[in-house]
Amino acid sequence: MSFQQPKSLNVLLLGDSCLDIYHYGSCNRISPEAPVPVFVEDEIEVRHGMALNVYLNLLAFNLAVECMVGDTQVEKHRYIDFKSKQHLLRVDLNEDEETGVFRFDERTMADVDLVVISDYNKGFLHPPACSSLARYCFDKNIPVFVDSKKKDLSCFENCILKINKNEYEEVVQYPNNYDLIVTVGAEGTLYKGEIY
């Protein structure tokens, strides 16, 4: 199978961001204070998550990407035992803090060929701004690809929606006009009634 590099595009990426922080260590004893393991940290690995991961993937295609994310960065700390590979604990920080809000402005759309939205429903992308963006892009023939955890997707009129099977079952409202791609795990991807 051959892979063709996409032509150079100017991409606007909008979404929520996080840092995925992996704490690797060992648990060799139980705490005398409570019946819990004592974790001794050996190594930390930090990865960009949510929209920042999408940003890195788009850059790998040598695309010109402008990334706009909320002010608050969620941190997801995962504690993993080296020996057993057991995921012991996850601690989320800044999960409920107020984030800046995206406000649609046509001036940010100069030279944009494509919009990608990575919405984890953390408060950065409010429906009215998403509706304005979707309407503008439809009028200008700019494709909008959306991966959203919102249960009401009606603000993404005329967009291409990508959700997973669990999210699909939780959505309460869709736009009037849209394309839908549903990822179904190892089975592949569902599009217009066909599995790919």
Describe each PLM feature range.
Residues 1-28, 33-34, 40-196:
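Ribokinase/PfkB-type carbohydrate-kinase core domain
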